């Protein structure tokens, strides 16, 4: 067995390619930063803060810019004796209701040992406890709710919190809410009253294009990678792959980081395009497998139905076209099939996980409908399914059909 030894031939500071790294300067977001600073200006002026809503795909800089500007804001308010600023940040990814968010905020504000139970209180009682904690802090309070779309349509807190002072629930505390969402449709699903308050100032973060991603990578490489350790075309390839997929800086950085790790493990002297291609395949496989862990049996069967249609070159296709395929797979797995509406819900979940893409068709005589297809490589999807479903015969048949049609 070999010994653990340091590998330092490629990376100078690999952490600079990680999600937690905060660069000294945010690249390619000058317009968004300027607009964001204008929205935060009332804090410095001593007025009640704006409620701000940010939306855009994962990895386009929403959270990074927020952290960057709020750090700067806290530094700058130190020059003013009449401003007392507190910032509370909460990631809502695992929280699916206003009640859960309110409990987490209360417990974030209370000292260790003083937390409240996550169940057992009426919702308004929890809200009241939250107002008491906010009033105890006083001054200006910015509450950042990242991935706020996780709470779905149970959005009462998003209505109550921005209006707390106007409704007499707060006296001295001036609260502003910053909501960050990866879901473009979340805003439209909010109660109109919530839209009026939470979306006082809206900032959209568009996907990065390949040129912007290459510039971001170049700035990080200066910190993260040793001189001469990236072959010509590597950064351009990372940028092009990420731009073609989602426009995510996180994806581009992950490709470079993993490509560097693959190069080091193979004792290469520099990162080459082949390492990036291998990194892409590995990340795509991990993405599908991660999504699989969140799926129920019916979610997996719904996905296998789409994979089967893809093997036959029959995608994109509608829910009703997938339903017979799904029912057949349920029969093979001795599982009771759900109704067509429930299948539609599982397909929507797969879309949210980034495993499927959906194209809206507005020409239907009975209203709009979606056509679904894989948003991950066919090979990655079928391999992941073979690990989680005991349908060897059916999956082998799908593979054979795909091979006949040169799919994957």
From Swiss-Prot:
GO terms for biological process: DNA replication. GO terms for molecular function: ATP binding; ATP hydrolysis activity. SUPFAM superfamilies: P-loop containing nucleoside triphosphate hydrolases, Winged helix' DNA-binding domain. Keywords: ATP-binding, DNA replication, Nucleotide-binding, Plasmid. Transmembrane segments: none annotated. Pfam families: AAA_22, Cdc6_C, Cdc6_lid. InterPro entries: AAA+_ATPase, AAA_22, Cdc6_C, Cdc6_lid, ORC1/CDC6, Orc1/Cdc6_arc, P-loop_NTPase, WH-like_DNA-bd_sf. Belongs to the CDC6/cdc18 family. NCBIfam families: orc1/cdc6 family replication initiation protein (TIGR02928). Involved in regulation of DNA replication. This is ORC1-type DNA replication protein 15. It comes from Haloarcula marismortui (strain ATCC 43049 / DSM 3752 / JCM 8966 / VKM B-1809).
